[in-house]
C-alpha cells in the first residue's frame, strides 16, 4: 500500500469520510440535498481538511451537473480557464464543451442520472468513477430512441486549483453507450 494512504479501521475511515462529505456541503441543507454524494470516498492521509473539503465540493458540484444538467453547477465547479485534457474531436474547449455534451446527452436520454460510485482525493487531484443511467427516448445524431436502457461508466481525473476543476482527463465507456443507443455492433 502506498505510503500516501495509511490504513485505518473501518469505523475511523467511515467517520473521516462522513466528516469530509459534511464539511464539503453547501451552506444550507436544501442545497446539500441537491448534490450527489459519493458512495465511497477515500482521502489521502495528511491532506489538509480544508483542501480536501474544497476538492470534494468541486467534484460533487460537477457530478451533480452531470446528474441534473444544471449549468450553474458546472459554472461553479469549473475554473474560468478550465481545460479538457482529453478533448473529444469536435467538442469546444473550456466550459462550453461540457455544457454542449450535457445538452446532447439530455436530448438523447432526458432521464439521465449520474452517480459518483467512488471518489479518491490526493494532492491536488480528485479521481471519480461515475455511473450514468437512463433511457434513450430522445434523439442522438439523428437516431431516435425507443426507450432502451442506457447504463455506462466514466472515470475522470480532476486537477483542482482554488477550489475549482482546472483540468480534466477522462475516459468513457463509449462503445458500451453506442451499442445501447443502437449505433454500434
Predicted regions and their residues:
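Bacterial N-terminal signal peptides that target proteins for export
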Residues: 2-16
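C-terminal segment of classical bacterial N-terminal signal peptides
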Residues: 21-29
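Short, low-complexity N-terminal intrinsically disordered segments enriched in polar/charged residues
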Residues: 31-76, 80-81, 184
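Short beta-strand edge/turn micro-motifs at domain boundaries
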Residues: 34, 127, 151-179
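A solvent-exposed, acidic/Ser-Thr-rich amphipathic alpha-helical stretch
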Residues: 57, 71-123
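Hydrophobic pocket/interface hotspot
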Residues: 62, 73-75, 82, 98, ...
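A mature extracytoplasmic/lumenal domain signature
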Residues: 118-120, 132-134, 172
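Exposed beta-sheet edge and beta->alpha loop/turn motif
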Residues: 131-162
Amino acid at each position: 500500500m502506498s505510503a500516501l494512504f495509511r490504513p485505518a479501521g473501518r469505523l475511523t475511515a467511515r467517520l473521516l469520510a462522513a466528516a469530509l462529505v459534511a464539511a464539503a456541503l453547501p451552506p444550507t441543507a436544501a442545497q446539500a440535498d441537491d448534490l450527489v454524494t459519493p458512495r465511497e470516498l477515500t482521502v489521502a492521509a495528511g491532506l489538509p481538511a480544508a483542501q480536501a473539503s474544497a476538492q470534494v465540493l468541486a467534484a460533487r458540484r460537477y457530478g451533480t451537473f452531470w446528474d441534473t444538467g444544471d449549468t450553474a453547477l458546472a459554472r461553479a465547479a469549473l475554473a474560468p480557464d478550465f481545460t479538457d485534457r482529453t478533448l473529444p474531436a469536435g467538442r469546444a474547449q473550456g466550459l462550453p464543451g461540457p455544457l454542449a455534451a450535457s445538452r446532447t446527452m439530455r436530448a438523447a436520454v432526458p432521464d439521465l442520472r449520474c452517480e459518483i460510485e467512488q471518489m479518491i482525493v490526493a494532492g491536488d487531484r480528485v479521481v471519480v468513477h461515475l455511473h450514468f443511467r437512463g433511457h434513450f427516448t430522445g434523439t442522438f445524431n439523428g437516431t431516435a430512441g425507443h426507450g432502451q436502457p442506457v447504463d455506462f461508466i466514466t472515470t475522470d481525473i480532476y486537477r483542482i486549483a482554488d477550489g475549482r476543476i482546472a483540468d480534466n482527463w477522462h475516459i468513457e465507456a463509449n462503445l458500451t453507450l453506442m451499442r445501447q443507443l443502437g449505433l454500434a455492433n
